[in-house]
Every structure is written in C-alpha cells, then in structure tokens.
Amino acid sequence: MGSLSPWHWVVLVVVVVLLFGAKKLPDAARSLGKSMRIFKSELREMQTENQAQASALETPMQNPTVVQSQRVVPPWSTEQDHTEARPA
C-alpha cells in the first residue's frame, strides 16, 4: 500500500490519454515545459537581484565623510520685530 506499482502507472497514463486526447498531449507538455522554463528564469533573476542587494549592503563605506554641524537661524528669530498679521 502507498507505493504505485507499474500497473497503476499504466492505468494512470491511459486515463490521461482518454481525458485529454492524443492530439492535445504534446501541446500540453510543450506549454508545461515553457511555463517551467519561465518560472526557473524568474527564480534565477530574483536570486541574482537578492545577491546584488546583499553584496551592496555588506560592502562598507570606503571614505566616510565627516559633516560639521551648523546652527540654523529660523526666519522668525528674536532679533526681528514681531508683527502679527491681522485679518482685514
């Protein structure tokens, strides 16, 4: 029980041929193969993208730039007159 004997495979093949017909089987196999090739190429492409992203994240910065902090004076500083706009 549980394993398929050669007779099971023969019956399965006969049922598939009867269901799909002998003319449609080559087309079905061809489209299945084409779909598998597309799927594999997409997987390969995703893996190369992930590897490129991982290598970009792993490379340390060669020459980090030191930035000095600067004081930013807001336009409404206390040195200017404070006027409030009043609605007309």
From Swiss-Prot:
The chain crosses the membrane at residues 1-21. Residues 49-71 have a biased composition (Polar residues). Keywords: Cell membrane, Membrane, Protein transport, Translocation, Transmembrane, Transmembrane helix, Transport. The keyword RNA-binding does not apply. It is found in: Cell membrane. Residues 49-88 are annotated as: Disordered. Residues 79-88 have a biased composition (Basic and acidic residues). InterPro entries: TatA/B/E, TatA/E. It is a single-pass membrane protein. One of its GO terms (biological process) is protein transport by the Tat complex. It holds the Pfam family TatA_B_E. The keyword Iron-sulfur does not apply. One of its GO terms (cellular component) is TAT protein transport complex. GO terms for molecular function: protein transmembrane transporter activity. Disulfide bonds: none annotated. Part of the twin-arginine translocation (Tat) system that transports large folded proteins containing a characteristic twin-arginine motif in their signal peptide across membranes. TatA could form the protein-conducting channel of the Tat system. Belongs to the TatA/E family. The Tat system comprises two distinct complexes: a TatABC complex, containing multiple copies of TatA, TatB and TatC subunits, and a separate TatA complex, containing only TatA subunits. Substrates initially bind to the TatABC complex, which probably triggers association of the separate TatA complex to form the active translocon. This is Sec-independent protein translocase protein TatA. It comes from Mycobacterium leprae (strain TN). The gene is tatA.
